Amino acid sequence: MQTVRMTTAQALVKFLNQQYIEFDGEQQKFIKGIFTIFGHGNVVGLGQALEEDAGELEVYQGRNEQGMANAAMAFAKQKHRKQIMACTSSVGPGSANMITSAATASANNIPVLLLPGDVFATRQPDPVLQQIEQTHDLSISTNDAFRAVSKYWDRINRPEQLMTAMIQAMRVLTNPADTGAVTICLPQDVQGEAWDFPSYFFQKCVHRIERRLPTRASLADAVEMIKRKKKPVMICGGGVRYAEAAEELKQFAEAFRIPFGETQAGKSAIESSHPYNLGGIGVTGNLAANTIAKEADLVIGIGTRFTDFTTASKQLFQNEEVEFVNINISEFHANKLDALKVIADAKEALLALINELQAIEYRSSYTVEIAAAKEFWETELARLHNIRFTGQDFKPEVEGHFDDNLNEYVDALGTQLTQTAVIGEMNTLLDEDAIIVGAAGSLPGDLQRMWTSRKPNTYHMEYGYSCMGYEVAGALGAKLAEPSKEVYAMVGDGSYQMLHSELVTSLQENKKINVLLFDNSGFGCINNLQMGNGMGSFGTEFRYRNEETRKLNGAIMKIDFAASAAGYGVKTYRVTSVEQLQEALKDAKKQTVSTLIDIKVLPKTMTNGYESWWHVGVAEVSNSQSVQAAYESKVSNLQKARSY
């Protein structure tokens, strides 16, 4: 047996360079590159290996471990999970910073390889710098926290353990049914230890993603159920995009006159203008999709996890005869809602169903309902696009909260812009193939409802974990995946303040991204939630502390985000009017460096709910009558929802 004497870290780098993916007959390198933030826990081990011979891995320098790992996830998401990035951090706080990103990747079923440095396997220098000492178990380190949020976790305590660990890591990273974050912990001493690795460990390895076919029995059962139903609706989930099954879903919809709603992950698989595309569905869905869904007697989920936002906490589907068919590569997700399970690749399942249903000449009984719902929503969309602040008689979309002090925001922020009008202008002015990236706050709701996707795969929303701070890093990841397209981070001031470190990395790499920063001086989405459930405005507006009351109810804070970003070298713009917005968007396209448009918008001017409900933990006992009323409303809505 031929062997190669290498350090553990050198062997890892060599192994990663030999991993390939094959999908529908096309092969490509699976691991494009690696994000790094070096510290004592990885610099002389994995860092040395990368310096000596990184192979074809592109080595990127992150600014924050969570930020770079979010960028890695976004890269894989935009690549439809066919190519990924790895990330390495030092021990302790560096690795802990990636835990949130691991959770984000796993919640979204997006493959990311995390390589955190770890404490010494020998324990000779214990406690090493940045080590936590647990008196009940000395084998525990910070990295054990990754166990709860990783789809596969391992620790390499001996060099030879690398081989079995990485084989299992690749199994999970390339498994569409159960992929997510894979964490391989690398004790800093073991990284530098040498071993005689067998040469076959470094052979080219091609991981073929097979398209799983539906079983005859599940296919027959699905056909039997569908043919009994008159008003079915489909839900287009992220699995449609990852399986590249958009054309088959279109064929299915057109052949049998079945409309479909989109989840956040599924949106832009098919252009918004398609006659059977109702748009976003659920809590952040629009009126067209939710109206049709309420009356549907069959829900066909395709590549969806059926989250509470998609099902409106399982209260959306009100037809007493409603049943579910779940097409999913994951048995776990297919098993939800007592559904008839079709555990298969989305494309193969749809093709098989098309053949069977065409043979019996099935058609839904819809006549004008679909077109009428879409037309009604288009009218509402035009209204949202044209909302302008009109002074004292102005009624914001979210009424009854700030009606008496909205003018305070007009004066403090120096703006009269409404959020829906800004989004309308952006949708008109951005290139058709531009990619928008979002994650948290009120923007995901506005975008799922309002954004018209004119080209496939241009809507990139992380809403599985809704991780604040994903947006800017996510834009960088999407840009690395599709460097020829303009990429826009749609981010609120709350999320931007949490994390925007990789904006600097975009400058360093000459990968232009555009940050569209909506500043309403607060956590506006959560303010809506608390006030909509009977509370006052508490801890969600960005106000100075009032010296008299000692509460955060002083003057509204105004932050010059443009000035801050300009210090990095970003091209910046300040916007308080529609005309300024139009000029800024046009000029930003001409730039070669990353841009930031600081857009001051009025609170409560985002979209509100459309025929949906969200189950949250309203207080059962309170001295507040409005909270009591909110609890009674919750109980009433819960009675209309499925129990599981």
Swiss-Prot record:
**In which residues is Mg(2+) bound?**
493, 520
**Does the keyword Iron belong to this entry?**
no
UniProt: thiamine diphosphate binding residues: 65
According to UniProt, this protein's pathway is:
Polyol metabolism; myo-inositol degradation into acetyl-CoA; acetyl-CoA from myo-inositol: step 3/7
Task: Describe the reaction catalysed, as an equation.
Answer: 3D-3,5/4-trihydroxycyclohexane-1,2-dione + H2O = 5-deoxy-D-glucuronate + H(+)
Which keywords belong to this entry?
Hydrolase, Magnesium, Metal-binding, NAD, Plasmid, Thiamine pyrophosphate
InterPro entries with a match to the protein in the record: DHS-like_NAD/FAD-binding_dom, Myo_inos_IolD, THcHDO_hydrolase_firmi, THDP-binding, Thiamin_PyroP_enz_cen_dom, Thiamin_PyroP_enz_TPP-bd_dom, TPP-bd_CS, TPP_enz
Q: How is the cofactor bound?
A: Binds 1 Mg(2+) ion per subunit. Binds 1 thiamine pyrophosphate per subunit.
Name the domain of life: Bacteria
Listed GO biological process terms: inositol catabolic process; isoleucine biosynthetic process; L-valine biosynthetic process
A Pfam family that this protein carries is TPP_enzyme_M
Q: What is its EC number?
A: 3.7.1.22
Q: Which GO terms describe its cellular component?
A: acetolactate synthase complex
SUPFAM superfamilies named in the record: DHS-like NAD/FAD-binding domain, PH1570-like, Thiamin diphosphate-binding fold (THDP-binding)
Record's HAMAP family?
A: IolD (MF_01669)
Identification of the protein by name: 3D-(3,5/4)-trihydroxycyclohexane-1,2-dione hydrolase 2
